[in-house]
Amino acid sequence: MGQNSGLLSSLTDWNSTLAGYADSISTGVVMPVALTLLALFMILELYNATQRIAMNGSNNAFTIQQIALVMLKIVVCRWAVVHTTEILNALFEVASTVAVGISGYVGSGEVNTTVDIENAIAALPGGIGNMPVALELMVVGWMLRIVNIVVNTIVAARFIELYVYNAMASLSIATLCYQELHGIAVNFLKSYLAVALQGAVLYLVIGFYPALAGSLGTGGSITEQAWAMLGQSVILLVAVFMSGKFTKAITNAMA
């Protein structure tokens, strides 16, 4: 299993404890506050409707239309707030479907090296003359480990971000009801979808690594191969860092 195999997991499968915390906080702490905000926005929407009715001369047909539209908006927005978790789960499922589809074409991958650096160092003949080579290999080995740690951290941070979104989401969704602030909810949903889709992009990018490593060949000295492997790993690291930018560009393009 590679580093990207965990990206196919659901939020509950990846860490059921954190998923439970997010659900509990959303239901027990954030939801009551969100419903209170929603009630305030409902009052403001009703006030705005009365202002529009007054400006239109209190026409009966227009009055009925405005009140009906406001009531429909209130019902829909309350449903959205109460079912925030289901909405986010649906968005996450869309992203997961993309990731699973990608996994059918790109296998799992991880930051490793076909150059066995530790054994290469151990196999070097003794003597001062080989110390520079050993030091080079040690430096490359440590840098590869750092790349590996950073990639793992970014993968984990993506899940942590989703748990935080799930815990606090209903506050943003509550703004859907109020015309002046509904963009907050829309932008929040775009951001959530971007983070969810980042899993698919990360799976794809990390899955590319074995192909990059395989393109190095076996020519050259052991140090040349090691530095070439490090270069490919750095390319992977840059792509992993840019994964969030890729998905935000996709979701921001949505109307």
Name every feature range the model reports, one short phrase each.
Residues 27-34, 64-68, 133, 140, ...:
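Membrane-interface helix-boundary signature
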Residues 75-171, 195, 199-255:
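Non-cytosolic segments of integral membrane proteins
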Residues 24-32, 36, 70, 145, ...:
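Membrane-interface junctions
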Residues 1-37:
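Binding/recognition "hotspot" determinant
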Residues 29-37, 67, 71-74, 163, 174-190, 218, 249-254, ...:
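Alpha-helical transmembrane segments
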Residues 26-30, 60-84, 185-194:
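Alpha-helical transmembrane segments and their helix-start/interface "positive-inside/aromatic belt" motifs
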Residues 40-71, 168-182:
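Hydrophobic transmembrane alpha-helix segments characteristic of membrane transport
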